[in-house]
Swiss-Prot record:
Binding-site residues, Mg(2+) 1: 190, 194
Catalytic activity: (2R)-2,3-dihydroxy-3-methylbutanoate + NADP(+) = (2S)-2-acetolactate + NADPH + H(+); (2R,3R)-2,3-dihydroxy-3-methylpentanoate + NADP(+) = (S)-2-ethyl-2-hydroxy-3-oxobutanoate + NADPH + H(+)
Domain KARI C-terminal knotted: 182-327
Cofactor notes: Binds 2 magnesium ions per subunit.
Family affiliation: Belongs to the ketol-acid reductoisomerase family.
A Pfam match: KARI_N
Residues binding substrate: 251
Residues annotated for NADP(+) binding in this entry: 24-27, 47, 52, 82-85, 133
Keyword Nucleotidyltransferase attached: no
Enzyme class: oxidoreductase
Descriptive protein name: Ketol-acid reductoisomerase (NADP(+))
């Protein structure tokens, strides 16, 4: 898989173009400011006079309604939540799409599953930082960047690569490295990573470990340190050095215990469950379930959020994070 860097990309394809960033959350703010600071012509499309409108104004952006931005722009970069995109697209963006324009995303969800179907003659691309928005902005300001992905679903103008690569360069992604993939691959791997490992798997593993120690009579504070707080140390080692060097950096006791016991935690059944989660993503079952949840105003999701907030590990964690001076990071 080829990795592109700054020297591989040029901004030329966007020099005379207007980019409308739709949405001003974490990614919207970071990506729009980075492109603006790279010398590109950026406008921000938002609901008029909302909190994001005022924030974008304060950051020095040319802010307008979504309809005005969609009409004005050559490239429309949609960065509002996945579940809102199709509705906003149909009512506020689609009427202003003309041949030669480019529709851009940072997640392929709505294109891949067919909730947004662009008209003929419109490019469809994706540029996705592989990092939270705050890190996208901070590393750019420090003169570097975060890695990212680019995809081209439809190349109606025969220069979609030039456009999406220029966006990646403007955001600062090519400073760290950019990989070209597909909407299908980006969407399905992103959802799987979130559900099975990064957000779902890891949190359930932490909770199970914490509860095991507490139920055995150990102090909740000790349980938190050993199953949650110290996780960052290990993740940072893996992030920076890989698995092999992580093992080299921990004690022999930790290495031997981890290598000989890990397969009893993540078993063949665990991997089978992961495969089923992946099938649900691939065949659209998860997407259908998520959209049904939206139709009932996220009742189940809200209930799960309340239950998570009531966990003992949350109470203990809040106390220890304050003790460690970490509360400012939350």
């Amino acid at each position: 898989m080829k990795v592109f860097y700054d020297s591989d990309f040029k901004l030329d394809a966007l020099k005379e173009k207007t980019i409308a960033v739709i949405g001003y959350g974490s990614q919207g703010r970071a990506q729009s400011l980075n492109m603006k600071d790279s010398g590109l012509n950026v406008v921000v499309g938002l609901r008029k006079n909302g909190a994001s409108w005022n924030n974008a104004k304060a950051d020095g952006h040319n802010v307008m309604t979504i309809e005005e931005a969609a009409e004005k722009a050559d490239i429309i970069h949609i960065l509002i939540p996945d579940e809102l995109q199709a509705e906003v697209y149909e009512s506020q963006i689609k009427p202003y799409l003309k041949e030669g324009k480019t529709l851009s995303f940072s997640h392929g969800f709505n294109i891949h599953y067919g909730f947004i179907v662009p008209p003929k003659g419109v490019n469809v691309v994706l540029v996705a930082p592989k990092s939270p928005g705050k890190m996208v902005r901070r590393t750019y300001e420090e003169g570097f960047g975060v890695p990212g992905l680019i995809c081209i679903e439809i190349d109606a103008t025969n220069n979609a690569f030039d456009i999406v690569s220029a966006m990646a360069k403007g955001i600062g992604l090519s400073r760290a490295g950019v990989i070209q993939t597909t909407f299908k691959e980006e969407t399905e791997t992103d959802l799987f990573g979130e559900q099975a490992v990064l957000c779902g798997g890891v949190t359930e593993l932490i909770k199970a470990g914490f509860e095991t120690l507490v139920e055995a009579g150990y102090a909740p504070e000790m349980a938190y340190f050993e199953t949650c707080h110290e996780l960052k140390l290990i993740v940072d080692l893996i992030y920076q050095k890989g698995f092999k060097n992580m093992w080299n950096d921990v004690s022999n006791t930790a290495e031997y215990g981890g290598l000989t016991r890990r397969s009893r935690i993540v078993t063949a059944d665990s991997k089978a469950a992961m495969k089923e989660i992946l099938r649900e993503i691939q065949d659209g079952r998860f997407t259908k379930e998520f959209l049904l949840e939206k139709q009932v105003s996220y009742a189940h999701l809200k209930s799960m959020r309340r239950l998570e907030g009531d966990l003992q590990i949350e109470e203990v964690g809040a106390k220890l994070r304050k003790m460690c001076g970490l509360e400012k990071e939350e």
